[in-house]
């Protein structure tokens, strides 16, 4: 690793907390509006698809469709919350408000900033995903214990999609480019990864492809927990999510370094 790259890596194990705290203090002023905005879409989908389509579909994989869907919506909510926090809020702090430039005049490195942004986005995903789980538990489609047990996977899902989105904002010149990521990456994952309907209904080639996507690993961990079943290949899914979180993190640091040096 060259000295230039090493100099932008996280300086230590705790500097990132300053970035997290800064974002939390700013978010606290608009917390209610932020939470409602993050929850409106997944809750609408949960009730609309769950009760509407559920009457037609009936039972799926041994459970009611709305219980099946609720677990998928927890994963989707974690994905979208972390993604949009990174795409829009982190991009604004980096490119529009130039907050990152000001922070770099302190003892924090670029790696500290990126790590703090990732953990902050994951924190918001925990709030969003857990809130959907609470709705499901309140309606009797999940147990309170299962929702608590799903929180670590929700947090890891948030880290994964924040890390992937961080690569996107390191390359995107403006907000306009985010629509390509949303349309070509996020939306297909929602429908291919088993969140809305079982992947067993798809052709084998699609199943193999979907199994490589990060949301599929998240769904395959969250759904068994919320339905109080054993998760198959849990270690494989956790390992895959860790790879999806770590590799884009290091890639984004290198890309941000090149961008800021222009």
Curated annotation (Swiss-Prot):
Residue ranges occupied by any ABC transmembrane type-2 domain in the UniProt entry: 33-259
Compartments (UniProt record): Cell inner membrane
Keyword entries, A-Z: Cell inner membrane, Cell membrane, Membrane, Nodulation, Transmembrane, Transmembrane helix, Transport
GO MF terms, alphabetically ordered: ABC-type transporter activity
InterPro entries linked to this entry: ABC2_TM, ABC2_TM_bact-type, ABC_2_transport, ABC_transptNodJ, Nod_factor_ABC_transporter
Keyword Cell membrane: yes
GO CC annotations, alphabetized: ATP-binding cassette (ABC) transporter complex
Lineage top rank: taxon: Bacteria
Subunit structure: The complex is composed of two ATP-binding proteins (NodI) and two transmembrane proteins (NodJ).
Role played: Part of the ABC transporter complex NodIJ involved in the export of the nodulation factors (Nod factors), the bacterial signal molecules that induce symbiosis and subsequent nodulation induction. Nod factors are LCO (lipo-chitin oligosaccharide), a modified beta-1,4-linked N-acetylglucosamine oligosaccharide. This subunit encodes the transporter.
Family, as annotated: Belongs to the ABC-2 integral membrane protein family. Lipooligosaccharide exporter (TC 3.A.1.102) subfamily.
Protein name: Nodulation protein J
Protein's organism: Bradyrhizobium diazoefficiens (strain JCM 10833 / BCRC 13528 / IAM 13628 / NBRC 14792 / USDA 110)
